[in-house]
Every structure is written in structure tokens, then in C-alpha cells.
Amino acid sequence: MKLKKYISFFRLRCVTGLQYRAAALAGISTQFAWSFLIIFAYHAFYRSDPTAFPMTLQAAVNYTWIQQAFLAMFASWVLDGDILEEITSGSISYSLCRPVDLYAMWYTKSLSGRISKVALRAVPILVVAALLPAGYNLTAPTDLPTFFLFLLTMVLGALNSTAFTLLIYVLTMYTLSSTGLRSLLLTLADFLCGGVVPLPFFPLTLRRICELTPFAATSNVPYRVYSGDIAGTNAAFAVGLQIFWLLVLVLGGHTLMKNALKRVVIQGG
């Protein structure tokens, strides 16, 4: 019975998100333009000396297309404005009256919102990217096990991204303003997860440090698994890190929320 409540929250938020088709179309056009700019830049750099780079050109192109197709799933800046408004306005009191776990409800809503955004954008981007000329197109994974590993890391990455988002909501309950947290944490997360530059292009020492952070457990792993940059024992280690950080983020976020709810004061009248 308890699970049905969260399924209802998930379905409701998903249906709501699927209604924003015009915004999705506008976003798709922007993502195509950005993808082509990045891929053209890769071609220009790789033309001089392909062996000087840590990833093959095709792997970098695949990384770019997968990143853009699933951007809304992993982007750290995809936040739920309704939840932030609940915290700052005091309407969180209504949510606290419901016979549900607040953390689980917010987690369900946030995950559903990400999935609905991706559902509108991913397929068109993937289809068009696969039909482009060689060197600019998205190619399939090297084999079936790699594809299934990609799906597994995608699920774990999405769960980690949502847990990180929940951490921002919970910390906002302590500060009453998300502006500072968003400016610091979201910029840091976007850089350290490989959202600006893929982690293989980082200096070796910095890359190894970044790969151990919770940020790398989001989009970095599935993108690099798909492009063939992570395989074998490295892939197993990466999946283990994803599971580890998921537990840390969820348990830590839930504990922080419990502590925050003990001190909640609803102001206004």
C-alpha cells in the first residue's frame, strides 16, 4: 500500500512533465547546435594528432551524443522549483501532514521529472545522431554485454543524480535560500562529472581524484561505458563506486532531513 502512494506521485509528475512538448522541441534544437559545435571542435583537434588524445575520435563523438540525449537525466541544474518553493514559502507544512516519507516523496517526484524530460528529447536526438555521416554519427556499443552494462550504469547514475538533487533540497532547509548552494554545488558537480570536458581529458592525477567523487558516479560512468572508454575490471569498480555513493547520498540525505525536520519552524500566518 505504501508503494502505491509513491507510484502515484511518480506517475503524476511524469504526466505533468510530458505536457511540455514545445519546451522540449526548443531544447532539442539547442542541443543539436551545441553537439555539432563540440564535434566540429573535436575533428579540428584530432586532425593534427589523433594519438595525442586519451579517447578515440569516435568515442568522443559517441560521448557527446549520449551526453546530449540524456542531458536532462543527469544535469545537476535540473531542480524542481515546486520543492524549493515549498521550503522557502513554508508550504512544506502541507507535505508534512501527509502520511508519507517526505524524502521518498521528493525523491520520487525529482526522478520522475528527470525521466519525463528525457522521454521527450532522447529518442529524436539518438535517431538523428545515428543517421549522420560516419565520423559525426552515433555508433552502437561494441557488443551486447557493453550495452547491458550501459543500461545498468544509466540507472545507477540517474539514481545518484536524483540523490544529489535531494541533498540540495535538504541543505536548503538549513539555509532557507538555495542561491548560494546552487551556485557552488551545481557548478562543481557539472565540472567534476565530465559535463564540461570528459574526465579522460583531465590531467591524470586530477582525473583519478575526480573518478572517486560522487559527481563521477552520475553521468561519467554510463557515457564512458557506452563509448568504450571504461570496460572490464574498471567497469566493475565504477559500478561498485556508483552503488557506494548511492547509499551514502541517500542515507546521508535522509539523516540530514530528519535532523532538519526536528527544527522546522513555519513562519507566517
Model regions: which residues?
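Hydrophobic transmembrane alpha-helices and immediately adjacent juxtamembrane helices
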Residues: 1-269
